[in-house]
Amino acid sequence: MKIDLEQNEDIYVLPDFRKIQLEAFHRFINQGIMEELDNFPKIEDTDQEFEFQLFGEKYYLLEPSVKEGDSLYESIITNSCKLYVPARLTQRKKGKVKEQTVFIGNIPLMSSQGTFVINGIARVIINQMLRSPGIYYKSEKDPDSGEITTYTATIISNWGERLQLELDANNRIWFRIDKKHKVSILLLLLAMGLNEEKILDTVHYPEVMSDIIREAKDEENIEWKENAVSELYEQIFGTTDEEDVESYDIFEELKKEFFEPKFELGRIGRFNINKKLNLNVPKDEIFLLPKDVLAAIDYSIKLRIGVGTFDDVDHLKNKRIRSVADFLQNRFKLALERLGDLVHRRINRLTRRKRVPTIGSLVTSDPLLKTFKEFFGSYPLSQFLDQTNPLTQVIHKRRFSSLGPGGLTKRIASIKARDIHPSIYGRICPIETSEGMNAGLISSMAIYASIDHWGFLQSTLHKEYDEVLFEEQNQDMADVSAEEYFRIATEACLAVSPEEDENKEIFTVAQLQQEFLTTSWDRIKLRIISPLQYFSVGVCPIPSFEHNDANRALMGSNMQRQAVPLFEPERCIVGTGLEGQAASDSGSVVIAEQGGKVDYVDGKEITLLVNGGGTINTKLITYQRSNNNTCMHQKPRVNLGEYLKEGQILADGAATEGGEPASGKNILVAYMPWEGYNFEDAVLINECLIYENVFTSIHIEKYEVEARITLNGPEILTREIPHLDDYFLRHLDENGLVLPGSWVETGDVIVGKLTPRDPEESLKIPEGNLLQAIFGIDITATRETCLKVPPGGKGQVIDVRSVYPEDDNQYRNFIYVYILQKREIKVGDKVAGRHGNKGIISKILPREDMPYLQDGTPIEMILSPLGVPSRMNVGQIFECLLGLAGGFLKRHYRVIPFDERYEREASRKLVFSELNKAGEQTTNPWLFELDNPGKSLLIDGRTGEIFQQPITIGKAYMLKLIHQVDDKIHARSSGPYSLVTQQPLKGRSRMGGQRVGEMEVWALEGFGASYILQEMLTIKSDHIQARQKIINNIVAGEPVDKPETTPESFRLLARELRCLALNLDHAVVKKDLIIDYKEL
């Protein structure tokens, strides 16, 4: 049977991964600003003599004076543009009109990478997934009988509150607002301006509604609509004086004040309600109408008699994405409201003082500046851009969160809200999500998914026939309800055997109405365009992940985001082909904007001579610190005089090679136990990984100090620091700043600073009184507040910046010192593969002790074989074997996952054929042995003997993660204690002590250290008197005395029991020891 799949010859390419951020910001700039300026009201004074007005259609933005690249690394600059709006002030009595274009504030600009630069720091706004505004129906069943007792309709507003309509078993309809107590629906209808006659004429079931009204009137005793408003306020918000709503005008004002702000549906909510209830209300009517409530009551009655459908609240058609445009437009609206209040107060104040207001005296930029500063600095969904490596940056910009204001909370979110729904396929990745309490609440966008102008997720599908399936202009974009009407083939292509009978019907797997079924190919209307269409950017680079358990694929995708850039980047031998797009869209790779000839190239810039005779000068990033303290650096990939085409690579980033992500290394690994040192995910490595800088990474730490004017005088930056040894000041210049290029150690001063001391404070110091009394000498009037290198912070100073904020009236000076560190891999560092196989370096072996191959090559890393079968991540075996073949053949493989759709065991056949080819072409027949395919005999480096069993070896792409022992190792002899329990504080940042928990107790018990364990749990921990004595006893070499009192934790327990009215009385433990009641 011949099937023509070429009738639609559209070429599908990967979309720009920054698209969702950039398009949303463009929508805010082009539409959102104008919409809010058009809604800005006319402002009048109390005498209605002056009128102020803004004209939104003529606004304009000024291009920022600082370039995008410069603002990112200047620590106080925000990348923004100035907003100017025409304004008019009318003086009605005199007929004077003044018009002026006013500056109302700065709008933060999004960079070309989809990020915002706020105070020199790259930030990103996470998209939020919320329940879409509209109406949703659900039912509640009796737990005993199983029958439906209540039908609930929930009307969700855009930014306001929720209204619930409940039809109970007694045919009574109630409503409630935001989980407050329920009130009769008749109150709501009468308060909205309806009467009984109009209600009965509008509904489709007047008999049922008549009974509801009659019972409600008997109970509520409501006769007229003004009384209904008063009763409504009284029952929902407390008591209300009825005289306040006696007049019709006040009634109308209260009705407007009550309904419009609380039930603003927005255009999306209006669209959903019209679609669900089959209404013809104009889309510009964005507030809840009485007609909507009556139609909702009708639909509830229909559900009672078996007509209509309930809604699945977890379906993506009932959810929308609140993007950057929505957040910024909402904040801009809030800023304009604050500006309107400010203008109103100022115009009234000036008219009361008999002064003539001017436009300049009324308008200020403070409301807009403060509102956006508050949003970017404190809003939960405005986050630091994760810049650990290029792949991390792309993933962070494509993330969704169900948390945040208006969303779910991670503590009470149900399993159903976190679970995978059939509607997410092709739109949200079912694998990549956070681990822990945020699992299922934070997810990533699939690679071909997009967001429409309503905020709904779409997926790209291929039409099989020339039928009109979608009304949208883009004929290949299917919205979230497409699977409700069409059969969608889940295979990207259809493989047909040439021996098949032409008349035989061919079946394929398809998706229809949230179900997966087998159907005839002739009934297929749509099909997916790629087998990777279901997954996100973080999952797609994992080779052979179809052979992994989903939990391990999740861990692998998360750990790829934690990989640090290495000293010498190396791209993976085995990949999936998606790597180049991720690297280019991350912004770490420099791409040629036009074709031309390389006219000049060095480590800092590249000049391209284009065809028209002009030049394009591109500055490169050199040793810049990222938000995660990793190094951002770009290296030229072109030579002088080379001719380039548009789109070719000019420079690679710190973690890219050849335009592909290169955050790891192709390491020769062996899966075997080795003396127990790789037990429980521990990893053994060869010392050559240290000497050859294979896993050496570069980190840049930023240290900050502020010099300001205090009450006792200005702080001084100087090299002359009293009472400090000259050795610690050896790197300072005459201004007290460290010299760039200096190698500094722990304790060295990098910024010398003296702070004035209060004269009275100087005399309080004992030596001050002594010097004053004997010699008449005043102690130094300053104290040393230098910035010193902290423990573990040694390195080379690469930059020193002194910054004076322009808008600061406190004359502050900020000094930033950047120190570069080269960190070699060491015991305690965390490494991982791309399949969730992670471990900690437990031992570094000499290269002569490592097992070696039959050609003499020593193994570079030994992994535990027990970590594969129980975790079910077999993809790592396919990767390392294919990587071994590629290493010998000098080839790189790009294998799209799910290759089993072509034939059974396709992955295994590919690996074995490449291993066999490598063995034949390199004269190493041991690479593929028929008796043990994929395994080889290894030789013990210590004895020279062959191991008894063949061992799986290969080249795996291993990553060095940002969880490094240099950042975690910590020790203290004594330090701060908790005031309540008197136990050491927790954490390195607080100078905390070792927390002896359950596993630590087991470790000490395993070594038989019973006395050490007893001391750590008692007297060294929370016994105040005993821990002071034990220091002297240890120094003097004397035995440790047994304490005579109880530890503080036992006293705390006794006090807590007393709070529960349980008193511990005297108890004789021994004849010579009685617990004293007073001590408790």
Swiss-Prot record:
GO biological process: DNA-templated transcription
Keyword Plastid annotated: yes
Record EC number: 2.7.7.6
Keyword Plastid in record: yes
Keywords (A to Z) from UniProt: Chloroplast, DNA-directed RNA polymerase, Nucleotidyltransferase, Plastid, Transcription, Transferase
Reaction(s) catalysed (UniProt annotation): RNA(n) + a ribonucleoside 5'-triphosphate = RNA(n+1) + diphosphate
GO molecular function: DNA binding; DNA-directed RNA polymerase activity; ribonucleoside binding
Protein location: Plastid, Chloroplast
A GO cellular-component term linked to this record: DNA-directed RNA polymerase complex
Domain of life: Eukaryota
Family note: Belongs to the RNA polymerase beta chain family.
PANTHER family noted in UniProt: DNA-DIRECTED RNA POLYMERASE I SUBUNIT 2
Role summary: DNA-dependent RNA polymerase catalyzes the transcription of DNA into RNA using the four ribonucleoside triphosphates as substrates.
Oligomeric and partner information: In plastids the minimal PEP RNA polymerase catalytic core is composed of four subunits: alpha, beta, beta', and beta''. When a (nuclear-encoded) sigma factor is associated with the core the holoenzyme is formed, which can initiate transcription.
Protein name: DNA-directed RNA polymerase subunit beta
Gene label: rpoB
